[in-house]
């Protein structure tokens, strides 16, 4: 592997469980209505009405098991793989500050030995709000 590219996301800690609250009988999680996501603080910035509709039309359920189980990370060499973080809903400066402060969600960023940051200001779903800019950023990172 030559590079890991994170899009408005980042590495997690060993054993991290994204949604430990999910009951065992939940198999899939549907995309909530976008107005509910807005109310919960999900970053929908940059999504016009057409993009919101496409997002809802194309959304597929997320397998619940992938959110309920611990994520095992056994090989510390993962931190030596070059990484690019494309920062959309928060700036790269904020990501760096949170990582340096040891914030639970961002602490693994500080463990990356070769990370570059790209700011692409928009919401959490740049594939809907800025698809060409996102494709350009991924392409540039892949050539790095």
Q: What annotation goes with each model-predicted range?
A:
Residues 129:
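Residue-level signal for the nucleotide or nucleotide-sugar donor/cofactor binding architecture
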Residues 3-5, 84, 116:
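A structural signal for isolated positions on well-ordered beta-strands in alpha/beta enzyme cores
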Residues 1, 5-41, 65, 72, ...:
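Flexible "cap/lid" loop of the alpha/beta hydrolase fold
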Residues 126:
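Glycosyltransferase donor-binding loop in the core domain
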Residues 92-121, 136-141:
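Conserved loop-alpha-helix segment in the C-terminal half of the alpha/beta-hydrolase fold
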Residues 1, 74-80, 110-112:
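Short, conserved loop/helix-junction motifs that constitute active-site signature segments
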Residues 54-76:
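Active-site nucleophile elbow and catalytic-triad environment of alpha/beta-hydrolase enzymes
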Residues 79, 85-87:
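Short beta-strand/loop motif that positions the catalytic acidic residue
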């Amino acid at each position: 592997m030559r590079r890991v590219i994170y899009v408005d996301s980042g590495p997690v800690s060993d054993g991290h469980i994204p949604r430990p609250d999910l009951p065992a009988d939940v198999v899939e999680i549907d995309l909530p209505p976008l107005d509910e996501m807005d109310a919960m603080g999900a970053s929908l910035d940059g999504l016009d009405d057409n993009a919101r509709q496409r997002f809802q039309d194309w959304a597929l359920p997320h397998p619940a098991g992938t959110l309920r189980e611990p994520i095992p990370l056994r090989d510390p060499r993962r931190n030596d793989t070059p990484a690019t973080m494309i920062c959309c809903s928060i700036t790269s400066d904020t990501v760096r500050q949170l990582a340096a402060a040891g914030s639970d969600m961002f602490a693994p960023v500080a463990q990356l030995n070769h990370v570059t940051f790209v700011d692409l200001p928009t919401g959490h779903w740049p594939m809907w709000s800025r698809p060409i800019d996102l494709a350009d950023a991924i392409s540039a990172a892949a050539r790095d």
